[in-house]
């Protein structure tokens, strides 16, 4: 059975935790393991933080959009902004690369996403925004023992 959710919120830092918890709550119906749930929450946090800090440069008038589809123990997520976009995607995907070293960011967001998810694709155009598509195949074992 296919199930979908769509979320839109202002690009405010305090909404990052809202997005993370909302996505985790929606995915919980598939009974993921704690590791799987933690990985998904971390990825959502990284993608939303990137949209807010880099996409909109903390301009709270921007919006972040999240779509999640659940189908056959697979989680498909799209996290999108309409912000500044990424001028050099290859460089941005390098570990430790950051455009904002003054904020003491680690530059590991895309690396974390690529390590925790089964598939990651990023589409970005300057002044048009960024769309990140993520796929995670969940184990079919139950998270809790009976």
From Swiss-Prot:
Gene Ontology MF: a single term: sigma factor antagonist activity
EC number in record: 2.7.11.1
Top-rank taxon: Bacteria
Catalysed reactions, as listed in the record: L-seryl-[protein] + ATP = O-phospho-L-seryl-[protein] + ADP + H(+); L-threonyl-[protein] + ATP = O-phospho-L-threonyl-[protein] + ADP + H(+)
UniProt keywords, alphabetically: ATP-binding, Kinase, Nucleotide-binding, Serine/threonine-protein kinase, Sporulation, Transferase
UniProt KW Transferase keyword: yes
InterPro entries per the UniProt record, alphabetical: Anti-sigma-factor_SerPK (IPR050267), Anti-sigma_F (IPR010194), HATPase_C_sf (IPR036890)
GO annotation terms (biological process): asexual sporulation; negative regulation of DNA-templated transcription; negative regulation of sporulation resulting in formation of a cellular spore; sporulation resulting in formation of a cellular spore
Keyword Phosphoprotein: no
Pfam families reported for this sequence: HATPase_c_2 (PF13581)
Family according to the record: Belongs to the anti-sigma-factor family.
Record's function text: Binds to sigma F and blocks its ability to form an RNA polymerase holoenzyme (E-sigma F). Phosphorylates SpoIIAA on a serine residue. This phosphorylation may enable SpoIIAA to act as an anti-anti-sigma factor that counteracts SpoIIAB and thus releases sigma F from inhibition.
The name this protein goes by in its record: Anti-sigma F factor
Originating organism: Bacillus subtilis (strain 168)
């Amino acid at each position: 059975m296919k199930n979908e959710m769509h979320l839109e919120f202002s690009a405010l830092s305090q909404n990052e935790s809202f997005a993370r918890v909302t996505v985790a709550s929606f995915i919980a119906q598939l009974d993921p393991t704690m590791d799987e749930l933690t990985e998904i929450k971390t990825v959502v946090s990284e993608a939303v933080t990137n949209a807010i800090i880099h996409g909109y440069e903390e301009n709270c008038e921007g919006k972040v959009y999240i779509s999640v589809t659940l189908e056959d123990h697979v989680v498909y997520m799209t996290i999108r902004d309409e912000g500044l976009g990424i001028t050099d995607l290859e460089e941005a995907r390098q570990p430790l690369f950051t455009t904002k070293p003054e904020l003491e960011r680690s530059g590991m967001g895309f690396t974390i996403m690529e390590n925790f998810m089964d598939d990651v694709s990023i589409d970005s155009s300057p002044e048009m925004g960024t769309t990140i598509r993520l796929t995670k195949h969940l184990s079919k074992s139950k998270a809790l023992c009976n």
